[in-house]
Each structure stands twice: as structure tokens, then as C-alpha cells.
Regions:
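N-terminal Rossmann NAD(P)H-binding glycine-rich loop of SDR-like oxidoreductase domains
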Residues: 2-27
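Non-catalytic, hydrophobic alpha-helical segments
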Residues: 14, 70, 185, 189, ...
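NAD(P)H-binding glycine-rich loop region in Rossmannoid oxidoreductase-like domains
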Residues: 31-103, 114-116
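Glycine-/Pro-rich loop/turn segments that contact NAD(P) or position catalytic residues
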Residues: 76-163
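Glycine/proline-rich active-site loop of Rossmann-fold NAD(P)-dependent oxidoreductases
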Residues: 152-160, 192-203, 226-228, 302
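Glycine-rich Rossmann NAD(P)(H)-binding loop
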Residues: 170-175, 203-210, 222-225, 232-235, ...
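Substrate-positioning beta->alpha
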Residues: 170-193, 201
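A hydrophobic C-terminal alpha-helical subdomain
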Residues: 235-305
């Protein structure tokens, strides 16, 4: 029985939901964060915040002592100096795997649908490297792969819309992409953390729709009372960013390269025979439309989605 869990990445969009969900179930949750101020929104008698960084094997090992499960909800796609997919998603997860092994704990690793050694996305390659490290270890683990969090991209579209109410789309915006609600993913991660029968398995979760960025942007525009189409950053501009601005600002360079890949790679999702919601029928299946309505309700007015 899992009664004490350590979560790395517990202050983020996904991690916060998992922390609160597990604590509500009566699980003692230890949140490892490199900045305790970022955990100020996490409060409760079952929630403990400790200082640690997945890039540092010593603090990671210390944070895992005494727990029965370690959950990795980290990602290094964007962040301050030294944060990258290589240092966080590959090396950091390797440290978490070793910490779980040393503590005699089980592991839940958050990964990405499409993770592969030859992926055009650096993040996907590093997630695959972490999965490989799990497979080579003796840790009893569950890997959860998800598609793109729709809340993340809605945030980006809303924040770039400005007074014109025309969100900024990187590239053509015509490539179908599967979007999933982070709430759906959190519900699965919470479940498998406690369900030890899922150990040794890789589970995939996606959303109910494949949408282009143009389609998602137009949904945001419509909810905010507009009718025009989104603005676009041409592919040529994105291609130029990598060898120029990207050298000075690596995060921006990664974002440009990711945008190019998302504009042409197959990012659709079909559950098929491994439909996670057939296995767990009570898992939520939130549509992008419902997520947008929730944003509207949370902010009070459509112009503050």
C-alpha cells in the first residue's frame, strides 16, 4: 500500500493537481522543489515541501528517503539557466530513478506520446532516454505518456492575442495535433501512483480531438467575442531563429525548433486497442471546448479567458 509519496515537479501545472489529489486521498506527499516559494500555493497537513533539484543527485536522493513511491512530473523544456531537456528530463530523471531504487520505492515517470530516440523534438528524445533508464533499472515503475496539454497552449494563445484578439500561431498552424486536458492526465497519474498493478507498464493518454493550432486559436478568438483569424510567425522566421537568437537564448531556440516540428510532424492520437479509458472508465475525458469554458468561468469574463 502506498501511503507516502515524493513528487518532483509538484509545483507545476500537472504536479500541483497530483499533489492535491493524492493528499485529498489521505496520502502523505513530499514535494521536492528548487524554490520553496513556488510551493506557496500547496498547503495542507499531508503536504511537506523540501528543497531539492533533480539535477543534483545528492538532494534528490535525500528527498526520496522514507517514501514508497516517487513521481516524476518534471520537464526541462523551458526554464532558467541550466534547465534543459538533457539536464532535467534525461539526467534529472536518471537521478530520480536511482533515488527511488536506493529508497526501495516504486516510480511513476511522466513521459510523452511519441517519445523516441529519433524524434525531431529534443524533449521527446530525452523523455525516451529516461524511459530507457527505467527499463534498465530494477525499479518497479509505471510510465505515463500523454499528448500536449491543451491548457498550456490556450495560455500561450490568450497571452499573445493582445488588444487585437488575434493569437500568434507559430508556423502554418494547419497540422493536426492531439490535445489533452492536464486534469485528465493528473487523474491518471494519481490513479497509477496508488494502483500497483500498473507497474511494469507504459500507459498512454490523449484527448478526444485532434485540432490544428489555427482551429484552437479560432476557438479562443470566438470565446473572446472576435471573428478574425490568428496571426502567424512564418516558418522561415522560425528556421532563422535557431542558428541566430537560439545561440544566445537556448530556450527560445528550442521553442522555435519545436514549433517547426509541431508544424509538420504527426502529432495525432488514436487510443486503439490500448484505450486507457476503456481500462479505467471513470477517467475524465475533457474536450478543448470544455477547457475553454472552464477558463472563461475561472476568469469571469470572456476577454480574460
Amino acid at each position: 500500500m502506498i501511503s507516502r509519496v515524493m513528487i518532483a515537479g509538484g509545483t507545476g501545472r500537472l504536479g500541483t493537481l497530483v499533489v492535491n489529489g493524492l493528499a485529498a486521498r489521505g496520502v502523505d506527499v513530499r514535494v521536492m522543489t528548487r524554490d520553496p516559494k513556488r510551493a506557496a500555493h500547496l498547503a495542507g497537513e499531508r503536504i511537506e515541501v523540501v528543497l531539492g533539484d533533480v539535477r543534483d543527485p545528492v538532494s534528490t536522493m535525500k528527498s526520496a528517503v522514507g517514501v514508497q513511491a516517487v513521481v516524476s512530473a518534471v520537464h526541462g523544456f523551458a526554464g532558467p539557466g541550466g534547465v534543459s531537456p538533457a539536464t532535467v528530463d534525461r539526467d534529472g530523471n536518471t537521478h530520480l530513478i536511482k533515488a527511488a531504487q536506493e529508497a526501495g520505492a516504486e516510480l511513476v515517470l511522466m513521459s510523452i506520446v511519441g517519445a523516441a530516440p529519433d524524434s525531431p523534438f529534443e524533449l521527446f528524445r530525452m523523455k525516451y532516454a529516461a524511459e530507457t533508464s527505467v527499463a534498465a533499472s530494477t525499479v518497479s515503475a509505471t510510465v505515463v505518456r500523454s499528448t500536449a496539454f491543451v491548457e498550456l497552449w490556450i495560455d500561450l494563445l490568450v497571452n499573445t492575442a493582445g488588444r487585437s484578439n488575434r493569437p500568434l500561431v507559430f508556423g502554418r498552424g494547419q497540422n493536426p495535433i492531439n490535445f489533452v486536458s492536464v486534469h485528465d492526465v493528473a487523474a491518471l497519474v494519481e490513479r497509477v501512483t496508488l494502483d500497483q498493478t500498473t507497474r511494469g507498464q507504459t500507459l498512454e493518454i490523449g484527448g478526444p480531438e485532434n485540432l490544428t493550432f489555427d482551429e484552437l486559436a479560432r476557438m479562443v478568438i470566438a470565446l473572446r467575442g472576435g471573428s478574425d483569424g490568428p496571426r502567424h510567425v512564418p516558418r522561415a522566421a522560425l528556421q532563422a531563429m535557431g542558428p541566430t537568437i537560439g545561440r544566445l537564448l537556448p530556450t527560445l531556440g528550442r521553442q522555435a525548433q519545436a514549433a517547426l516540428a509541431m508544424d509538420q510532424s504527426d502529432m495525432t492520437f488514436s487510443a486503439g486497442v490500448n484505450d486507457i479509458r476503456a481500462r479505467f472508465p471513470d477517467l475524465p475525458c475533457t474536450s478543448p471546448e470544455e477547457t475553454l469554458r472552464n477558463f472563461h468561468a475561472a476568469n469571469g469574463r470572456a476577454d480574460r479567458v
